[in-house]
């Protein structure tokens, strides 16, 4: 995390991923990059920052304040921006300015969540991505950064396009479940690389 040149060499980002990313970001359009605690999720965010993309990560406060401080200090030292999950106005301003927001969606969320399928079981999940797409026109790109041999490779399912029917609650549920399905497919492909230590499917 402290040697940018080595990091750039070890992360393989296919030309197709770069092409999609640049097309979505053309004209400084905002992007939501959606991922999971799979492989090395921090690495691609750092790659983006080192390549000059305006990236901000949405993070939850860790239970250990010293680790929380150290991890976020590294993120910011490399040039990234960090938002706490409750800083909605700052996140919105970042998107309005054409920034990229990087978030992990495979975690239990109680407040404001929708209960949709995740890996075959109902799970409370944030509908944040669909809400930000609808409000700011942010493009959505699901990605993972997974281990291959001694390095890491970035994969994407391509741009995710939310669908709207006029039923806001139903749209939030359907689009969130679709995103869960995409992340779930990546997790099923690389189950040994999924890091999850708490009850993802607990009751609200």
Which functions belong to the PLM regions below?
Residues 1-35, 69-73, 77-79:
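Membrane-anchoring hydrophobic helices of lipid-metabolizing enzymes
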Residues 16, 41-45, 61-63, 101-103, ...:
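Short hydrophobic/aromatic-rich motifs at helix boundaries and adjacent loops
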Residues 6-12, 60, 77-83, 118-120, ...:
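Short, flexible loop segments at the rims of nucleotide/cofactor-binding pockets, characterized by
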Residues 19-27, 50, 54, 86-204:
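Non-catalytic C-terminal accessory region of glycerolipid acyltransferases
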Residues 29-86, 108-118, 147:
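Catalytic core of membrane glycerolipid acyltransferases/transacylases, capturing the structured
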Residues 7-10, 35-36, 53-56, 93-96:
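Short acidic/polar alpha-helix capping motifs at helix-coil junctions
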């Amino acid at each position: 995390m402290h040697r940018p040149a080595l990091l750039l060499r070890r992360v393989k980002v296919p030309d197709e991923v770069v092409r999609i990313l640049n097309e979505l970001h053309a004209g400084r359009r905002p992007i939501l990059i959606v991922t999971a605690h799979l492989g090395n999720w921090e690495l691609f965010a750092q790659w983006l920052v080192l390549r000059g993309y305006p990236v901000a990560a949405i993070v939850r406060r860790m239970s250990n304040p010293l680790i929380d401080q150290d991890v976020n200090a590294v993120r910011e030292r490399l040039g990234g921006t960090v938002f706490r999950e409750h800083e909605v106005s700052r996140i919105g301003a970042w998107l309005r300015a054409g920034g990229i927001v990087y978030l992990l969606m495979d975690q239990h969320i109680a407040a404001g969540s929708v209960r949709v399928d995740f890996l075959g079981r109902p799970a409370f999940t944030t509908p944040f991505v669909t809400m930000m797409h609808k409000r700011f026109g942010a493009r959505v790109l699901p990605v993972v950064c997974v281990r291959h041999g001694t390095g890491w490779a970035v994969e994407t399912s391509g741009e995710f396009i939310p669908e709207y029917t006029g039923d806001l609650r139903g749209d939030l549920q359907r689009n969130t479940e679709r995103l869960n399905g995409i992340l779930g497919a990546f997790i099923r492909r690389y189950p040994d690389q999924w890091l999850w230590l708490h009850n993802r499917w607990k009751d609200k």
